[in-house]
Amino acid sequence: MTKVKICGLSTEEAVETAVSAGADYIGFVFAPSKRQVTLEEAAELAKLIPSDVKKVGVFVSPSRVELLEAIDKVGLDLVQVHGQVADDLFENLPCASIQAVQVDGNGHVPNSQADYLLFDAPVAGSGQPFDWGQLDTTGLAQPFFIAGGLNEDNVVKAIQHFTPYAVDVSSGVETDGQKDHEKIRRFIERVKHGISGTK
């Protein structure tokens, strides 16, 4: 069954909702954004997450030192890296890694050392999907996440199109820029039970 990552959580209530609804991954954004949390805030929120739900830290062009500090302080299970990725960034990390790839039309999939790939829209967090026809995942070495403009109305179609390891959502479960607990529940319900949306 396709796994679900709910990203950009910053409150106890949102974390508890995502966990109780059946999220497999909880994402904390450490890169500058409206969803950014500090290591200290994430460490407190991480206490609410059971061990079978994986904690993911989201970074943009980080150093290895930054990753190691966050892994240690927050107890991250995975790091997700956007932007520049040094050749040795993922070597011998004490947790698993996800490299984000912006799908921008050239169809290029990097030769990555990461454990997972995540395919996202050209502007991450924008709520806009990428053109699914521009991505060919045939023969990929790694399991992959699909992100970029997913919501309760299109996520089942995305799963049918790509058969991904997991789907990732942030703005698609928000209302007016805040996490919407009902949208979180409905999104996870759609993924887990294959209930198509209205569009």
Swiss-Prot record:
Per the UniProt entry, the disulfide pairs are none
Which enzyme type, at the first EC level?
Answer: isomerase
Q: InterPro entries under this entry? A: Aldolase_TIM (IPR013785), PRAI_dom (IPR001240), RibuloseP-bd_barrel (IPR011060), TrpF_fam (IPR044643)
Q: Does the keyword Isomerase apply?
A: yes
**Biological or metabolic pathway of the protein:** Amino-acid biosynthesis; L-tryptophan biosynthesis; L-tryptophan from chorismate: step 3/5
Q: Record keywords: Isomerase included?
A: yes
Name of the protein this chain belongs to: N-(5'-phosphoribosyl)anthranilate isomerase
